Amino acid sequence: MAFRIDILTLFPDMFNIFNHSIMGKALEKDIININTINIRDFTEDKHKKVDDYPYGGGAGMVMSLQPIVDSLKRVKESNRGKVIFLGPRGKTFSHEMAKELSKEEELIFLCGHYEGIDERCYDYIDLEISLGDFILTGGEMACIPIVDSICRLIPGVLGKNESFMEESFYEGLLEYPHYTRPENFKGKEVPKILLSGHHENIRKWRKSKSLKITKKRRPDLFKKYNLTKEDEKLLSSEE
């Protein structure tokens, strides 16, 4: 059965990006199923309005409760997944969160816009996620990378599992450097060890690079990583 994702949004066309590349192939193979639902289709306002002025005054407009609730109710008739809202008050998204959500079978994403949503909408939301301490023009901008990050962990989307098992963050470290042809470009050479064909030495070189890059660039991640005796030797090795 395909992994199902329903996205409630005011701008369905923004998600056409999923029709391309790896995600597009996963959709064609029915590994994942991504549906967009236009919240505007559920408004009872004769002018198709989905927002209104905030009580108490203030700048901007607030997304109305009625079309959000009614669109959620319609989707939940066939999708029993968690309802996830993309907003700045949410828990910061991480690779660990992506792994946990990829274990689900169905998910529902709600994309906010304008100044936000009517606070009463939170009674219908299971989880709020933020991309970080910055503001975007709409939840769609946050939803796209989050959905992509989750879907690429679903078996079959990337092909071989090794494709993501060796990537940054999968084991809590940043990824090692990559090289391809030519072997020498204007004096910039590929490390000789990668041309040696010695798989164990290549593995150790990559792990060493991964450890050292993480320690230098993301000390916060490095502190959380449990070093093995081999890791300690690799960290102290000269290259």
Curated annotation (Swiss-Prot):
GO terms for biological process: tRNA N1-guanine methylation. One of its GO terms (cellular component) is cytosol. Its main location: cytoplasm. S-adenosyl-L-methionine binds at residues 112, 131-136. Pfam families: tRNA_m1G_MT. InterPro entries: Alpha/beta_knot_MTases, tRNA_m1G_MeTrfase_C_sf, tRNA_m1G_MeTrfase_TrmD, tRNA_m1G_MTases_N, tRNA_MeTrfase_TRMD/TRM10. It is found in: Cytoplasm. GO terms for molecular function: tRNA (guanine(37)-N1)-methyltransferase activity. Keywords: Cytoplasm, Methyltransferase, S-adenosyl-L-methionine, Transferase, tRNA processing. It catalyses: guanosine(37) in tRNA + S-adenosyl-L-methionine = N(1)-methylguanosine(37) in tRNA + S-adenosyl-L-homocysteine + H(+). Its EC number is 2.1.1.228. The keyword Transcription regulation does not apply. The keyword S-adenosyl-L-methionine applies. It is an enzyme of class 2 (transferase). PANTHER family: TRNA (GUANINE-N(1)-)-METHYLTRANSFERASE. Belongs to the RNA methyltransferase TrmD family. HAMAP family: TrmD (MF_00605). Specifically methylates guanosine-37 in various tRNAs. Homodimer. This is tRNA (guanine-N(1)-)-methyltransferase. It comes from Clostridium tetani (strain Massachusetts / E88). The gene is trmD.
